[in-house]
């Protein structure tokens, strides 16, 4: 797996740019026998590709921004509770189907496993999310 032209993104980051990308709509490609890129029919998961890109760029943090304040235990039920922090092990025990927070949790865990800070929360609370004041933070283990 690779991100074509990642060197351009690395250059932008090295110059101090904030890189916002992998928001969906990417074009999946493979390399043909002549090492040329060729489009294929496939789906690119924006959360997983964002975690992959963040690792490739050596990012300190991965914020997965959405329209809900946090990951919820029992989402959609009267007993729903927002989760402020989850360990990787705890996240695996949650029942989060693919159409819900499942891919975001998988991506956040992947990045956290590599030693990075990962969090899921509202776009409007991105700064608070980054500082640990909002959303759900995925950690290797509780401290």
Where are the predicted features?
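C-terminal catalytic "cap/lid" subdomain
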Residues: 1-143
